Amino acid sequence: MSNSLGKLFQITSFGESHGDCVGVVIDGVPAGLAINVDEIQIEVDKRKSGAKAHTTPRREDDRIEIFSGIFNNFTTGAPICLVIWNKNIDSSEYERTRSKIRPGHADFTGFMKYGGFNDYRGGGRFSGRITAGHVMAGAIARKLISTIGIEVIGYTAELGGITAKLPKHKDIRQNISQSDVNCPDLAASKQMVALIQQAAEEGDSLGGVVECIGLNLPVGLGEPVFDTLEGELAKAIFAIPAVKGVEFGAGFGASRLRGSKNNDPFNIQSDQIRTTSNNCGGILGGISDGMPLHIRVAVKPTPSISLSQPTVNLDTMTNTSLEIRGRHDTCIVPRAVSVVEAMTCIVLADLALRAGIIPRVIKQ
């Protein structure tokens, strides 16, 4: 099992959904970065259950404990260990149905790969619960890249087929704060909430699309040919449970354009070389080009649904059916926004360190 990501800014994730805790160890954080637990807690609170509409009934406080690497509200240069304790655990439903593999989950593949020794409760290591550790690491990465002016903004762009109309970048954060689903289009947000309510009443679930924008990236982030900016981002984002697709800029839409329409013309803007369009999503040749980074992430519907589904009983090797009565989200897209942001920040921090743009000691 591979649990680490990054080269200079490296995170190692640990914990399971129904284990004692989830957490992360972060190696390579420069010394002297001002950070306190409240700044990390703010990011973690964005993804926790109960923060948005129709999230899982499992309520966790998600209070952070710092075990190492931060002293007097500054990073020391030592590994940072952050932990959240799991307190609201109910494994009864998973014990009741443990022999029945849940469609859409990693029960079958995890059982086969690890010989049945894996922790199946709540999805174990495959659960979205582990992303709390990603978000803790992302909070530190966000603070680190802010020292060179980079800002990362994520939002719900589509949910259940309802597509948002996007305002200007400067208005996105304000609108998101007024939305129960992290959508900057407030009219679409109300429609999304109603659709989630309908799906919940029907015992079903919904998917959607998260968009993430990176602003003020310097030219030069990315290490071709195998550690390109989009390659590293895609790897990190695909580590988020339920993500089924990632595209940059025009993405798959570029395949339907002619070169004359897809190419982004260059010009001089405020003494800087920029492009007049951004079909490339801020990346050329695997390297940031100074334009806004633009990522779209496809998130599948929550596989845990209350409807009866055909499946297999592993103990008897017979066909059977399953109705899931556990605690689950009707739609995880709004909560996934903070995780996509976190993984983006982590990758940008790592590549900025590798490029020498961020120093090993932060001078205040």
Curated annotation (Swiss-Prot):
Pathway of action: Metabolic intermediate biosynthesis; chorismate biosynthesis; chorismate from D-erythrose 4-phosphate and phosphoenolpyruvate: step 7/7
Enzyme class: lyase
Reactions that this protein is recorded to catalyse: 5-O-(1-carboxyvinyl)-3-phosphoshikimate = chorismate + phosphate
One matching Pfam family: Chorismate_synt
Cofactor binding, note field: Reduced FMN (FMNH(2)).
Coiled coil: none
Protein name stated in the entry: Chorismate synthase
PANTHER family given in the database record: CHORISMATE SYNTHASE
Keywords: Amino-acid biosynthesis, Aromatic amino acid biosynthesis, FAD, Flavoprotein, FMN, Lyase, NADP
Oligomeric and partner information: Homotetramer.
Enzyme Commission identifier(s): 4.2.3.5
Record: residues binding NADP(+): R47
GO cellular component: cytosol
SUPFAM superfamilies, per the entry: Chorismate synthase, AroC
Family: Belongs to the chorismate synthase family.
A Gene Ontology molecular function term of the record: chorismate synthase activity
GO terms of biological process kind: amino acid biosynthetic process; aromatic amino acid family biosynthetic process; chorismate biosynthetic process
Gene that encodes it: aroC
